Amino acid sequence: MFIKVLGSAAGGGFPQWNCNCANCQGLRDGTIQAAPRTQSSIIVSDNGKEWVLCNASPDISQQIAHTPELNKAGVLRGTHIGGIILTDSQIDHTTGLLSLREGCPHQVWCTPEVHEDLSTGFPVFTMLRHWNGGLVHHPIAPQQPFTVDACPDLQFTAVPIASNAPPYSPYRDRPLPGHNVALFIENRRNGQTLFYAPGLGEPDETLLPWLQKADCLLIDGTVWQDDELQAAGVGRNTGRDMGHLALGDEHGMMALLASLPAKRKILIHINNTNPILNKQSPQRQALTQQGIEVSWDGMAITLQDTAC
């Protein structure tokens, strides 16, 4: 299995365009050791030629321009994106669909709950019908494996996770199980597995078996502490309000990852306020000591027979 991180930041990217928090200003003036990041999305493949896009960030055009694997040479117009899977209906995971309109029709897999949000509150499915048929919806059901024709050796399973519906959704603060899913992806040729969850609130007993059998975790690293936005003076929401489990809290993401056997544990969807963006921060060093990696834009991951 081949995985490439197109974008590793949370909504707004890093630096965020209107933010002068310590991280954003530090990156701009060169006083911290950090790198710019676009908003969260990845591609996966069973052969390194045809790819499935998992979430379409607002930065998708820039991300594709920096990903030669997706350029389909020899045709006037084309792409090696053979399908799109959405894990939720959040703005930072779906706005990029609008930028892909010239390539419609696109085959899009998502739950009925996500499709409802994207047909009403943020109606991209409706808007894009005028572009060569727009987005073709393939419903996915929780814990029911499915495949995408472009990558037939990859089996995807949507796993419901505790998070939140987007602010525009009528289900905000009362999400249904299909509003947020992780993806458990298995290469049926060699059995290697990836668990992808860019947004994860509170893990429960039903989620743990999926986490425990994954060879590689690509998982929510949004905030270091639950009140991070408040402490930085840039917002009122807590990590929990937004549907994200804080890394450094007593029973947070680091503690969860320490209990799991995955060969690699990699963080994605990192907010601009998170101190782990600074490679020299104590928080980043704490991750390194526990063998937890921080993804970056363009990071390539290969899952082979014996290791990932």
From Swiss-Prot:
InterPro entries: Metallo-B-lactamas (IPR001279), PQQ_synth_PqqB (IPR011842), RibonucZ/Hydroxyglut_hydro (IPR036866). The keyword Iron-sulfur does not apply. Keywords: PQQ biosynthesis, Transport. GO terms for biological process: pyrroloquinoline quinone biosynthetic process. Transmembrane segments: none annotated. Coiled coil: none annotated. Belongs to the PqqB family. PANTHER family: COENZYME PQQ SYNTHESIS PROTEIN B, HYDROLASE C777.06C-RELATED-RELATED. May be involved in the transport of PQQ or its precursor to the periplasm. This is Coenzyme PQQ synthesis protein B. The lineage of its organism: Bacteria, Pseudomonadati, Pseudomonadota, Gammaproteobacteria, Enterobacterales. The gene is pqqB.
